[in-house]
Amino acid sequence: MLGVLLVLHGSKIPEWKDVGIKYAEYLSRYFNLVEFGFLEFNKPTLSEALSNLLAKGANKIVVVPLLFATGTHFKRDIPRLLGIDGDEKKIQYMGKEIEIIIADPLGFDEKIGEVLVKGVNETYNKNY
């Protein structure tokens, strides 16, 4: 069964968790197993979220970094926290081999650009 693991950076500000909850709820409309985890500061950690997916029966996991670009967190921290070494994209769980695929960061997308335009306009209209 496919599991989707959303990765958020995390912050000392607790509202980060609200973002994770809302994206997980949204994706749950399309996928049965969705969890989110943080790279730092907030809970659940990325490792805890992975464990939750595995406990629910995920045998293939697509990791979706909610990051805009490739950087240290993407290249080093996410694989390390998931227990992936080098090019190997599999982990062992209860005697089973679990495939983990890490999606690319969000990058540029016109739909995200539209959300930014909307935010600018709403902010401007509230203040003027």
Swiss-Prot record:
Disulfide bond sites: none
Organism superkingdom: Archaea
Residues that coordinate or bind substrate: K43, F68, A69, T70, G71, T72, H73
InterPro entries named among the record's database cross-references: CbiX-like, SiroHydchlorin_Cochelatase, Sirohydro_Cobaltochel/CbiX
GO molecular function, one term: cobalt ion binding
Pathway(s) it belongs to: Cofactor biosynthesis; adenosylcobalamin biosynthesis; cob(II)yrinate a,c-diamide from sirohydrochlorin (anaerobic route): step 1/10
E.C. number: 4.99.1.3
Pfam families tied to this protein: CbiX
Binding site for Co(2+): H9, H73
Enzyme class of the recorded protein, top EC level: lyase
Catalysed reaction, written as an equation: Co-sirohydrochlorin + 2 H(+) = sirohydrochlorin + Co(2+)
Alphabetical keyword list: Cobalamin biosynthesis, Cobalt, Lyase, Metal-binding
CDD domains listed in its UniProt record: CbiX_SirB_N
Active-site residues from the entry: H9
An example Gene Ontology biological process: anaerobic cobalamin biosynthetic process
Ion transport in keyword set: no
Similarity remark: Belongs to the CbiX family. CbiXS subfamily.
Subunit structure: Homotetramer; dimer of dimers.
Classification via HAMAP family: CbiX (MF_00785)
Function: Catalyzes the insertion of Co(2+) into sirohydrochlorin as part of the anaerobic pathway to cobalamin biosynthesis.
Protein name: Sirohydrochlorin cobaltochelatase
Originating organism: Saccharolobus islandicus (strain Y.G.57.14 / Yellowstone #1) (Sulfolobus islandicus)
Lineage: Archaea, Thermoproteota, Thermoprotei, Sulfolobales, Sulfolobaceae
